[in-house]
């Protein structure tokens, strides 16, 4: 397994609407997707589309959400994870485990509609890494 391109940076936010407004008014972002719920992951997300990547804004749906826990420690929000693409998520999981990394959970469908996994921050210099199977079409 070889790491692919950066897909997005995930940012946990207490209010996705307020965060979208900040990216529009402060940074001039004009291409922001409509927020949508992902009940299986306990989050609401949207993407700020940039010329070379995306910023994923993530708001917890309820107190059971892992993002809620993150915001308890970081009330204003902050960088949550960095996502890289891989060709085959199952190959990536096997390679990560073989290399001694802690993979958090099983592959599941992420916000782009492709399979994802997370690698524990202790294996990546304190950064939570999301590995996402490369979308087969445009993204």
Can you say where each PLM-predicted feature lies in the sequence?
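Hydrophobic, ordered structural segments
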Residues: 62, 75-76, 83-86, 98-104, ...
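Short, charged/polar, Gly/Pro-enriched secondary-structure boundary elements
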Residues: 55-56, 123-128
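Vicinal oxygen chelate
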Residues: 6-14, 46-49, 69-91, 117
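Helix-adjacent hinge/juxtasegments
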Residues: 54-78
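Intrinsically disordered, low-complexity, positively biased terminal segments
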Residues: 65-68, 104-105, 116, 121, ...
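Amphipathic N-proximal alpha-helical interface segments
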Residues: 60, 129-134
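Core segments of cupin and vicinal oxygen chelate
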Residues: 1, 11-54, 92-102, 106-114, ...
């Amino acid at each position: 397994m070889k790491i692919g391109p950066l897909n997005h940076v995930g940012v946990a936010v207490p209010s996705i609407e307020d965060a979208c407004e900040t990216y529009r008014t402060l940074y001039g972002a004009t291409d922001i997707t409509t927020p949508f719920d992902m009940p299986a992951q306990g989050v609401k997300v949207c993407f700020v589309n940039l010329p070379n990547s995306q910023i994923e804004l993530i708001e917890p749906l309820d107190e059971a959400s892992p993002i809620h826990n993150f915001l308890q420690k970081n009330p204003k929000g902050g960088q949550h994870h960095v996502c890289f693409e891989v060709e085959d998520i199952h190959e990536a999981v096997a390679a990560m485990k073989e290399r001694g990394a802690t993979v958090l959970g099983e592959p599941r469908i992420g916000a782009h509609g492709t399979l994802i996994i997370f690698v524990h921050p202790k294996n990546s210099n304190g950064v939570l890494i999301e590995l996402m199977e490369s979308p087969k079409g445009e993204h």
